Amino acid sequence: MSEKLRRCRKELTAAIDRAFEGVRHSQECTAQQRLDAPSLTSQPVHRLLCRNPLAACPSAAPYSGASCAPESENPAFGTHHIPVNSKLQQPLYPKRKPLTSKENVLMQSSILARDRQFWRAAGDGEDWRKDSLRKDMERDLKADPNVLLSSSSQEVTKDLLDMIDHTSIRTIEELAGKLEFENELNRVCGHCQDSPFKEEAWALLVDESPQKALDADPGSLKQALDDQNIVETVLDLEEDYNLMTSFKYQIE
């Protein structure tokens, strides 16, 4: 076993040495070719342009019509005979100026004058949001014309659009909060209609003093106070929601 390992080691070492010799030989050949190759950068540019491709091949030399003229005899390389083409001096494409550079804005401010009618003042943001909200709702209604809306659905939609136009609602979130508040108010009113103290609760909802209602029925003090607490809680919730909404838009 040791003899086999020793023989494998020798063969592996010999293969590695041969590989290194091949790499070294290829590097030496490449370096020699670079040294033997003529440097094109050392020659003048006019000699490179004047070089005849047939002159490089000895077999094609007899068939070449004319050899390259010397530098002093070739009129193409004279300092006073250089042809100048005016068309070549002009650029193929006009130089485009950047659209948002500071120089263009300052020097060519008249370009922006025709677009001033599209600018929107800072106070138009609320109206623009209302219009966009209204257009979104109208587009949702027109999305499926095959579906026939009932009269109640049309009335609800009309009420929502009127609410958008006549209130300070700007987003869907505010509209949802308004509807949630009205649903809660309707639920409280529904409970008041089922209660025996309907008139006292209704007086609280229309901001009348509960003392006037208590004069007619002193036994309804507890129920009236409970109803008043419910209404005040709902109003406080609405006020907190409005404050949070306005604070959110101020941050944005």
Swiss-Prot record:
Keywords: Differentiation, Phosphoprotein, Spermatogenesis. Disruption phenotype: Male mice are infertile with smaller testis and epididymis, but female mice retain normal fertility. Spermatogenesis in the male mouse is arrested at the spermatocyte stage, and no sperm is found in the epididymis. Germ cells apoptosis is increased without changes to the serum concentration of testosterone, LH, and FSH or synapsis and recombination during meiosis. Testis-specific. Highly expressed in spermatocytes (at protein level). InterPro entries: DUF4712. The modification Phosphoserine is found at S195, S209. It comes from the Eukaryota. One of its GO terms (biological process) is cell differentiation. Essential for normal spermatogenesis and male fertility. This is Uncharacterized protein C3orf62 homolog. It comes from Mus musculus. The lineage of its organism: Eukaryota, Metazoa, Chordata, Craniata, Vertebrata.
